[in-house]
Amino acid sequence: NLAEFVTEYETFDFVGFKDTVKKAVVALNEVLDEGLPLHPLIEQRESVKNWRQIGLGVMGLADMFIKLGIKYGSEESIKWINMIGTEMIFSALESSNELTISKGAYPMFNTKVVDTPFFQALNTKENNLRYQELRSNVLLRGLCNSQLLTCAPTGSIATMLGISTGCEPIFATSYTRKTESLVDKEKLYKVYTPIIQNNFISKGVPENQLPEYVVTSENIPYTERIQVQAALQRYIAVSYTHLRAHETLRH
């Protein structure tokens, strides 16, 4: 949950984020090992063993932007996505590399991975030293996993936790929920999206006076949605639920 790393001073805790990503990679590898013998088909077990694919993802991106006072889809939000994405992929790769000390590299590992456009794109002026160290360690020990990061829609999980789903914007600031009883009685009641309820409504800010940086899928231009996804998928595989305004043209 990216929103959890926003501090009370409206900054992002990159140190805590890095530590969490590394621990999550370790945890997912433990889950993979625990579940490996439970696959019913030998082909499945061999695939898991040979490729060791995990999928650490994110949710709460929209909530994070609201906490930071940044408009989803703005140029500033793209800069933040690049900073967070860079830290996430570096930390995940470093953790997977460190795991090879105890678990070894995944059997299908090939050193040519460091020559791929994806890996080489990490070599920027700001991250050159970190990149060179990572590259050397990968050539020396390999990686424990062939795949590391995957951003799922997280619809059910995020709703259960009361946070924004995956990397999507919030779909509305409020909505109407209906319940039905066994005697066919309906009850309609208004529900505020948790981030709106907690950060504004509960503090006396009316829904019609929310800050301009609070946007929903109904009022974000589809081009900005695409820019957000394009920025994020430089670092992580994305499964994206593209909620759009009703009047958006099919093209």
Language-model regions: role of each:
Residues 20-45, 49, 53, 71-154, ...:
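Internal maturation/activation junctions in enzymes
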Residues 74, 193, 248:
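Residue-level signal for threonine
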Residues 28-37, 128, 137-144, 149-244:
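Catalytic alpha/beta core of large soluble enzyme barrels
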Residues 3-6, 42, 55-57, 65, ...:
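Generic, ordered loop/turn and secondary-structure boundary motif
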